[in-house]
Amino acid sequence: MKTVFLCGSNLDGILTGVYDIYASGLSLSECRLELEAEYEPDLFSQYRSVTADSEKAGKVAAKVRSRMSDLAYLRISRAALHKSPARADWIFRFIRLGLRYGKQTLHMLQNEAVYEIFQMDRYVGNEAHALVEFTRFQSLKSGILLGKVWPENDVLELVAAHFADRFPDADWVLYDDRRKKAALHEGAAGRWQIRQGVTDGDLELLKRWEPKEDRKALEGSRKPEKAGAVPEAGMEDAGKVLEDRTAEETKEPSGDVYAELWKTFFASIAIEERRNPKCQRNMLPLRYRKYITEFCEMDQTMRNR
């Protein structure tokens, strides 16, 4: 009978699942690793729940780095962001193979697990790169830059890391509308964090946020050693914009003048005789256009294909 370990959907949860499989003493060929939120019950399998543990995940990560390579760990990290519900088991099988063959594992593309990890890593990396190029920010009247994305994979942190380096002094929010979470960057503190469970209503409150009001609370909090998510002590202060603001009725601006100017420029430089929608869709797929300024008024049916 197969034993299925059910883990969380993030990297820590998956690596903890790998650790628990090895620690169980069961035959590895009789074990599978699946995501707890997405698995389908099987009458002929027994199930074990995995509780995410950063210490266990760290041990697996260190082993992968030393035995396989830093590149192997990078591919695993990106594969964990893929949309596939089977990603946890592919990562387990990839690590199992890597612990046996070491650094040469990355070149064994004839192996199904290696090939799948390679494909997932490439797909996630390509989408993150595309969003870096295609993301559009709008300036709210509070001075915050707001960008919205609709990625197929969970690439918000990869994209946010780029913009944290690109706009280090700006206050901005990058919102993943598909997963209802956002990256919040506070320019005065020079750091950013991921907030879960952010709704469209929260984004409306952000339009009334004055960043200067919250900076005093942030200045006393400790900066993290590495760029990335804010430590727990600072998360409540930095995120209270999404929790403590009241939804006062205020008059919304008539429109973004620069957005209208950009749309006009985009339309005016087009050469009708050279118009090639098929080529344009190849270079800029329709799924990326939902929040791109110059395409915001295009037909809804075309946008959602």
Show the residue positions of the predicted features.
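Internal, well-folded beta-alpha domain core
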Residues: 104-200, 211
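Intrinsically disordered, low-complexity terminal tails and inter-domain linkers enriched
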Residues: 199-248
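Short, hydrophobic/amphipathic alpha-helical patches that form generic packing surfaces
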Residues: 13-24, 93-97, 161-165, 260-267
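N-terminal ordered "arm"
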Residues: 1-54
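Long, compositionally biased intrinsically disordered terminal regions
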Residues: 171, 182-183, 209-214, 240-305
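Charged, alpha-helical interface segments at or near domain boundaries
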Residues: 35-129
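Conserved aromatic-histidine-acidic binding/catalytic patches
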Residues: 3-11, 48, 112, 144-155, ...
